[in-house]
A protein has these predicted regions:
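Gram-negative bacterial Sec-dependent N-terminal signal peptides
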Residues: 1-23
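N-terminal, active-site-proximal structural segment of metallo-dependent hydrolase catalytic domains
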Residues: 20-184, 213-244, 253, 257-266, ...
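Alpha-helical transmembrane segments and their juxtamembrane interfaces
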Residues: 14-15, 47, 337, 451
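Residues that define the transmembrane beta-barrel architecture of outer-membrane proteins
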Residues: 247-249
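Active-site metal-binding loops of divalent metal-dependent hydrolases
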Residues: 37-38, 107, 188, 273, ...
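Active-site His/acidic residue clusters
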Residues: 266-287
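Metal-dependent phosphoester-hydrolase catalytic domains
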Residues: 187-210, 214-219, 244-245, 254-255, ...
């Protein structure tokens, strides 16, 4: 009950109207930003688009049949019903947290971010309908982001002698162009003219970065590729010259927030770095994750080496207000990633350290209990901050990182314990505690005080 009351109280306080006239713009005294890895990584984009296009009535009919007369359904229909339940549960989570702007990670698209079928379908057929007595929620502004996942490279990047152009031969791991993409929903206007994307920024152009080298042939069960040895460059010179830094994309999306003092612009800095696991003999995913995290540390430091997809150069302008958000796939204390890089970002002089590692960092009661119940990865149960974990891996992977010139009212991880409302969204006896019920990640949110 506490979780419901605290979220409701804060969400009610998030906005104040400047007048009773419906034509009068809303003035915000507070704003909630969030990130959520939705686990909508379907086998094809078309599958997800079809699920999102299903009307509310069609969803209900299928789910009722699945629960009451499953023998009348084919196996494919049963699988679809389970996925529809998952989507509805994800929508309910969003309706409970009620962000003003948030990242939707692992929301597949067409690769270019041009097809809005799935994005609009999720909004209109799920978020727009009450889920389990929660209030519907709407977002006027949506950003479908182009991605490098599954994007053909034309090279044998994994050195297995084949050029498949998908999975490990794609610029970012994906079974097709658009898998594991991300999107942004916002109730605030997106300043489209000043959006910056860095999909094509080259890894080689980050100062200090070099072609990866084979460090240990024993890192892979199959050893080093034929004709290669420790110390050799992993990527061909031609591939390295074209290698994008971002496994998906790095985007700077300015949001315009009306406040009593005038319009406030907050840069929503979003990415979803490669997970630092499934490494080859050059430790490629570890290094890729590290470099993708370093990107933001340098960007908010206004370093000059950046160029975006439109040719504009330079990092974020000094003094800008920002929120870095997304599934960063890195934990500063445990896990397989470069802990120093994520720790450096969390403790940057340009971020609100109290909100990243201090008393205002997002926490939950469900995190510690997740280990006790055996729902989270046991090997990480000795983490120093179980209340801050954001996934069933038992790691803190998902972040909302505000700039040092932003004030924070509150924050949290939507990870209810068994004694709190919403627990059915993180554990179900039939669906489990991971992607079956909602996701293997938990939604992280943070409330900004816009009066200061």
């Amino acid at each position: 009950m506490f979780l419901k009351k605290s979220l409701l109280a804060v969400s009610i306080a998030l906005t104040t109207l400047s007048g009773c006239n419906s034509n009068t713009p809303t003035e915000y005294s507070a704003a909630r930003f969030a990130t959520y890895n939705l686990s909508f990584d379907r086998a094809t984009y078309e599958i997800l688009a079809d699920e999102m296009s299903m009307s509310h009535t069609e969803q209900s009919n299928l789910i009722n049949m699945f629960k009451q007369s499953p023998e009348r359904l084919t196996e494919d229909q049963k699988s679809t019903a389970k996925r529809i339940i998952q989507i509805r549960n994800v929508a309910e989570t969003i309706q409970r947290v009620r962000p003003n702007a948030f990242v939707l990670a692992e929301f597949n698209n067409d690769g270019e971010g041009k097809d809005m079928t799935a994005i609009n379908g999720f909004h209109d057929n799920y978020l727009a309908y009450s889920q389990n007595d929660q209030r519907p929620i709407s977002f006027t502004f949506k950003k479908n982001v182009a991605t490098n996942t599954g994007r053909a490279s034309g090279f044998d990047l994994d050195r297995d002698g084949k050029k498949t152009d998908i999975k490990n031969d794609a610029w970012g791991f994906g079974g097709y162009h658009g898998q594991y993409a991300f999107a942004i929903f916002s109730q605030f206007e997106i300043d489209e003219k000043n959006v910056r994307t860095f999909q094509n920024f080259k890894w080689k152009d980050m100062p200090g970065e070099e072609n990866l080298k084979i460090i240990d042939c024993k890192l892979s069960k199959s050893g080093c590729p034929t004709g290669m040895k420790e110390g050799d460059n992993w990527y061909s010179d031609e591939a390295w010259q074209q290698m994008p830094l971002s496994s998906k994309n790095h985007v700077d999306v300015p949001l315009i927030i009306p406040t009593k003092a005038g319009n406030e612009v907050i840069h929503f800095l979003v990415s979803h770095p490669a997970p630092p696991i499934f490494n080859n003999v050059a430790n490629h995913n570890y290094e890729h994750n590290r470099a993708e995290l370093k990107f933001w540390d340098d960007y908010i430091n206004a370093k000059s080496y950046f160029y975006d997809d439109n040719g504009k150069t330079g990092g974020l302008a000094a003094g800008s207000k920002f929120i870095i958000a997304g599934d960063m796939n890195a934990d500063a204390m445990k896990g397989d990633g470069d802990r120093l890089t994520i720790d450096k970002l969390l403790k940057s002089p340009y971020v609100n350290i109290n909100a990243t590692v201090g008393g205002k960092k997002p926490t939950s009661k469900g995190g510690p209990e997740c280990f006790d119940l055996g729902h989270c990865k046991a090997e990480n149960s000795n983490t120093l901050y179980p209340e801050a974990i954001t996934s069933v891996s038992g790691l803190r992977l998902d972040y909302v990182i505000p700039s040092s010139n932003l004030s924070i009212n509150n924050s949290g991880v939507f990870f209810p314990s068994s004694r709190e409302e919403g627990y059915h969204l993180v554990f179900d006896k039939e669906l489990g505690a991971s992607k079956g019920v909602t996701s293997d990640h938990r939604m992280v949110w943070m409330d900004l005080d816009l009066t200061k």
